[in-house]
Amino acid sequence: MSEQSICQARAAVMVYDDANKKWVPAGGSTGFSRVHIYHHTGNNTFRVVGRKIQDHQVVINCAIPKGLKYNQATQTFHQWRDARQVYGLNFGSKEDANVFASAMMHALEVLNSQEAAQSKVTATQDSTNLRCIFCGPTLPRQNSQLPAQVQNGPSQEELEIQRRQLQEQQRQKELERERMERERLERERLERERLERERLEQEQLERQRQEREHVERLERERLERLERERQERERERLEQLEREQVEWERERRMSNAAPSSDSSLSSAPLPEYSSCQPPSAPPPSYAKVISAPVSDATPDYAVVTALPPTSTPPTPPLRHAATRFATSLGSAFHPVLPHYATVPRPLNKNSRPSSPVNTPSSQPPAAKSCAWPTSNFSPLPPSPPIMISSPPGKATGPRPVLPVCVSSPVPQMPPSPTAPNGSLDSVTYPVSPPPTSGPAAPPPPPPPPPPPPPPPLPPPPLPPLASLSHCGSQASPPPGTPLASTPSSKPSVLPSPSAGAPASAETPLNPELGDSSASEPGLQAASQPAESPTPQGLVLGPPAPPPPPPLPSGPAYASALPPPPGPPPPPPLPSTGPPPPPPPPPPLPNQAPPPPPPPPAPPLPASGIFSGSTSEDNRPLTGLAAAIAGAKLRKVSRVEDGSFPGGGNTGSVSLASSKADAGRGNGPLPLGGSGLMEEMSALLARRRRIAEKGSTIETEQKEDRNEDAEPITAKAPSTSTPEPTRKPWERTNTMNGSKSPVISRPKSTPSSQPSANGVQTEGLDYDRLKQDILDEMRKELAKLKEELIDAIRQELSKSNTA
């Protein structure tokens, strides 16, 4: 065959569908084809043949007639038409389009060279200027053979040379295209490899990060676990140390209390009360107040001595509070502690010596716990004097003889000769043993009591013993009253004068005592063995009436003194407290009815106790000294005692002695209510003075408002304050010493309101005083507001003029 390919290009062959007016792929399937232009050298004709690259399907086979209109619509899409249809080639690249267009132009030139050279140029220009689908007449198909010799055209050799050059160029372009294809594939492969490598690296980094986070989390959990274990060990160690400290404290207290307990177990029979008289005339003693049915057997007291294992020592904050009060007041009395000085703790808690004398089965209160509440202490008439010696080096002044009301379960301990430094640190208690089922031998004959003070005297300040304030909750009789004592539900305590106590022996003590009096010296005072004669004038009193059961921490109810006909039953207690003890039995048939109660005994001056000059004559002087000493304590801060209204009186007896505690325990209430009137007049005078100062400078007005706030807060205490020199801040500490000093209005209860001559004085002029004070405050505030507005206006006017 004499046909040769003069051109090769890669293009998608398309045909135009006249029915649908769109281009469709030739052969029915899309894809690139190899399109060739073949030149038949024998008859000098050209045709276009295209085959699919994939399956070599022939998609175009058409002849190139002379005068063909070849249209290059775009750089990569060329088109032409023949008699049957319109063809289009969508080339793969610009190079393929240029090569195919050059070969097509060459073929058209060869075909047109048979006519004239001018027609060749015209055909080339027409083909380049054609921009649309053929709009000229359809060219006839050339089937005739061209003549062998072409007139006025290139020779056959020239055409062969041109054809070979075109083929060479085509081969070079094909090689270049294949090289570029290989490079492109290589680039794509490298790109894929790079992406894969980056993905693997990213995954590896992610795994490493997760592993690192896991390791860090495990390490953090391990550290947290170690920290928790360390904290747990530290907490266990601290708890162990605290337990050891508590055990050590308990063992030390038990070991300190053991000698006293042992001495009480082996105590001799009760000594004669005649040997226990104070050096001079002491306060009225309970010489006749003894238990009617009592056994002279000593083991009775030993049985009562044994305490149950439930007795718990007070907490250390109580000791700190008592030490703070004792140090700040500088009292001449060393604090005698209620929790330590009263009941010794036996070393062996299970040891309870057997008693040869049958004790009554109705004595469960004697075995109760010794952890007494703070409201356990209320006023009581004087009880037998007992000498309480302070530890050496702690008491700064002469030691007074303090009357103490002691519970019946507490044994009487003889003095001890083993006190260090020659001073005795033990406390001797008079005991009222529990009644037995049958008659017993009478106790030793008591000494004749000193005559009571004359009743017409105004009641002097209460005795300086807080236990006096509460031992009468069972309607205990006054001094010299014959009365049989019964066992109480709770042992009494020996309070400390330091809990809000005065600074000298002349100052009246607080009749109510809180837990703040529990300090370390009292522990030493209760723990010393007592077996020898009492040194330093230790005085032992006869048995005192039993104390009442502990009251709740609400209002502390004190007992009312019994009327002349007989002792009334104890007052009703709040539902939160333990049941009251049985009332004291009536007077014995062989004794006269109790006389009217005398006024309470005055505070014992230290000099009078030790020099033997205490008598009935100097009691008014003692009350004056107490008032002077009370004036020195104006700035002493006090713990809130609003829950102790009226000092705790519960009786409705209108005797003068029952009013001695009406003023919050600050002192006796003067007869006739003169103290109340003086207090009200002083309050009104101070308010008038404040009102006169109201027109001064602004700072003074603020101070006046602060002073006005004081009467508002302390109105209720001032209405019941018995002494005209008392101020609202002068109340002694009657509750827990660890609380902050707060002044509050007492709660008015029918059983505890103070009275003067039988008239209730709680809310006498309260509303009028309140209204006057509020009016004064409004006036002062209005003045202050006007002055402030004037000052601001002056400043603004000055700034405007400037």
Curated annotation (Swiss-Prot):
Describe the disruption phenotype: Mutant animals are viable and recovered in the appropriate Mendelian ratios. they are smaller than their littermates until adulthood and exhibit abnormal cage behavior, including reduced activity.
| Compositional bias annotation for Low complexity | 255-278, 386-410, 485-505
Q: Where is the composition biased (Polar residues)?
A: 143-155, 348-361, 525-535, 731-760
Q: What is the effect of changing S255D?
A: No change in subcellular location nor colocalization with vinculin at focal adhesions nor with N-WASP at the leading edge. No loss of cell mobility function
Short sequence motif KLKR: positions: 632-635
From the record, what ranges are coiled-coil? 154-258, 767-797
Q: What is its main location?
A: cytoplasm
Q: Which residue positions does Phosphoserine occur at? A: S144, S255, S383, S738, S740
Q: Which GO terms fall under biological process for this protein? A: actin cytoskeleton organization; actin filament organization; actin polymerization or depolymerization; actin polymerization-dependent cell motility; axon guidance; cellular response to leukemia inhibitory factor; neural tube closure
Pfam family of this protein, just one?
VASP_tetra
- In residue numbers, the region (Disordered) covers 143-166, 245-287, 341-622, 639-675, 691-764
**Where do the sequence repeat units fall?**
175-179, 180-184, 185-189, 190-194, 195-199, 200-204, 205-209
Q: Its Gene Ontology molecular function terms?
A: actin binding; profilin binding; SH3 domain binding
| This protein's UniProt keywords | Actin-binding, Cell junction, Cell projection, Coiled coil, Cytoplasm, Cytoskeleton, Developmental protein, Differentiation, Neurogenesis, Phosphoprotein, Repeat, SH3-binding, Synapse
Q: Where is the composition biased (Basic and acidic residues)?
A: 245-254
Top-rank taxon: Eukaryota
Kindly state the subunit structure of this protein: Homotetramer. Interacts with APBB1IP, APBB1, PFN1 and ROBO4. Isoforms, containing the polyproline-rich regions with PPLP motifs, bind the WW domain of APBB1IP. Isoforms, containing the PPSY motif, bind, in vitro, to the WW2 and WW3 domains of NEDD4 and to the WW1 domain of YAP1. Binds the SH3 domain of BAIAP2-alpha but only after the autoinhibitory region of BAIAP2-alpha has been blocked by interaction with CDC42. Interacts, via the EVH1/WH1 domain, with the Pro-rich domains from VCL, ZYX and Listeria monocytogenes actA and with TES (via LIM domain).
Q: Give any extra note attached to this record.
A: Required to transform actin polymerization into active movement for the propulsive force of Listeria monocytogenes.
Name of the molecule in the record: Protein enabled homolog
Identify the taxonomic lineage of the organism of origin: Eukaryota, Metazoa, Chordata, Craniata, Vertebrata
The gene from which this protein is expressed is Enah
